[in-house]
From Swiss-Prot:
Protein's name in the database: Glutamyl-tRNA reductase
Active-site positions on this chain: C50 (nucleophile)
The enzyme's E.C. designation: 1.2.1.70
GO biological process: protoporphyrinogen IX biosynthetic process from glutamate
Family the entry assigns: Belongs to the glutamyl-tRNA reductase family.
Organism: Yersinia pestis
Sites annotated Important for activity: H99
Length: 420
């Protein structure tokens, strides 16, 4: 048995290919059942996200293993092997172990250190667990990978710094205000970036969120999810004074928030400070706003500078994380190699126990029939010794007959003959 990881990801295949090789949640049971019907496959986990599709398998090693698994993948997705062959990567043994640990820890992600992948790996594991498609080796590997990912998060700073615009905007707000729990936030727009910002802010339990958008309908579903109030863009002027933090990201060709609007809001607020974060290009907030006292304006360029600084910090943390993964993968392989002896030891003990049981039973019968106890015990010891050393003796004789001194020495070591 060997462990194998194969797949495609954002580094080896464009989205046009990745989307053709995905496994939907609805089809996962069917895919796992089909995979386990392959003669060489003893257990499997399928990880399928927007950036990667990977199979983690325990398999019987054979020369045509790659061809068989490529054929299965292509048949399942109705593709030609030529479509995927150049994009597929293969990891065996320790490389497969290390790859999964890197994936779970966010070290192989498009955004270095992103935490979402760990949840996706756990979900894939749970699917295989539910479908009873795990081998004992795979189960141990995934459980170990989860603990490695946790260790990487705990012992390094790989997840501490913002490397997305949305996360950077929220991090900036937390740096300036420390706690967000008593603050009111106005979000302008309802696109993907604002969605991410809203979810980050909800996690930090802001007191109140307002989402301003050109149409209420577009913003309503997001507002329902994060518990926000919805207003239209023309209502911003009247509500701006309510906000301590304003984060804007629309596709408007002209500014939505002007200097005069902010001046009126500051007057109403009696000059309590306001933080403006403008993520939009073109800008949603007039640059002159940043010149007002108690109005602090940051643009998308300011956020990019923060992101670049934070990415450098993550890359430094990744070096430490890679060291953890290397150490833990070696520890796992030590355990895995030891498992190779478990079945042999179990069989050997079972055989010895069977011999002991049979010969003890015969000895007890002899004693019950009146035989001399001392003679029975001596005979039992003699026969038991001969039975137990018979197979090793034959192996020693064969090794000597073959002139195989290396095997002869290995047998001597196994039998403890050179121990003093």
């Amino acid at each position: 048995m060997t462990l194998l990881a194969l797949g495609i990801n954002h580094k080896t295949a464009p989205v046009s290919l990745r989307e053709r090789v995905t496994f939907s949640p609805e089809s996962m049971d069917q895919a796992l059942n089909s995979l386990l019907q392959q003669p060489l496959v003893q257990g499997g986990v399928v990880l399928s996200t927007c950036n990667r599709t990977e199979l983690y398998l325990s398999v019987e090693q054979q020369e045509n293993l790659h061809e068989q698994l490529t054929a299965w993948l292509c048949n399942y997705h109705k593709l030609s092997p030529d479509d995927v062959r150049q994009s597929l990567y293969w990891h065996h043994g320790n490389d497969a172990v290390r790859h999964l640990m890197r994936v779970a820890s966010g070290l192989d992600s498009q955004v270095l250190g992103e935490p979402q992948i760990l949840g996706q790996v756990k979900k894939a594991f749970a699917e295989s667990q539910r479908g009873q498609s795990l081998s004992s080796e795979l189960e141990r590997l995934f459980q170990k990978s989860f603990s490695v990912a946790k260790r990487v998060r705990t012992e390094t700073e790989i997840g501490a710094s913002a490397v997305s615009v949305a996360f950077a905007a929220c991090s900036l707000a937390r740096q300036i205000f420390e706690s967000l729990s008593e603050l009111h936030v106005l979000l302008v727009g309802a696109g993907e970036t604002i969605e991410l910002v809203a979810r980050h802010l909800r996690e930090h339990q802001v007191k109140h969120m307002i989402i301003a958008n050109r149409t209420r309908e577009r913003a309503q579903s997001l507002a329902s999810e994060v518990g926000a109030e919805v207003i239209t863009l023309p209502e911003i002027d009247a509500r701006l004074a309510d906000a301590d933090i304003i984060i804007s990201s629309t596709a408007s060709p002209l500014p939505i928030i002007g200097k005069g609007m902010v001046e009126r809001a500051l007057k109403t607020r009696r000059n309590q400070p306001m933080l403006f974060i403008d993520i939009a290009v073109p800008r949603d907030i007039e640059p002159e706003v940043g010149k007002l006292s108690n109005a602090y304006l940051y643009s998308v360029d300011d956020l990019q500078a923060i992101i670049q600084h934070n990415m450098a910090q993550r890359q430094a943390a990744a070096v430490q994380a890679e060291s953890i993964v290397q150490q833990e993968s070696m520890n796992f392989m030590t355990w895995l190699r030891a498992q190779g002896a478990v079945e042999t030891i179990r069989d050997y003990r079972s055989q010895a126990e069977q011999v002991r049981s049979e010969m003890t039973a015969k000895a007890l019968v002899a004693i019950e029939q009146g035989a001399n106890v001392e003679q029975v015990i001596n005979e039992l010891a003699y026969k038991l010794t001969n039975r137990l050393i018979h197979a090793p003796t034959k192996s020693l004789q064969q090794a000597a007959s073959d002139g195989d001194m290396e095997r002869l020495q290995l047998l001597r070591d196994s039998l403890g003959l050179d121990q003093h």
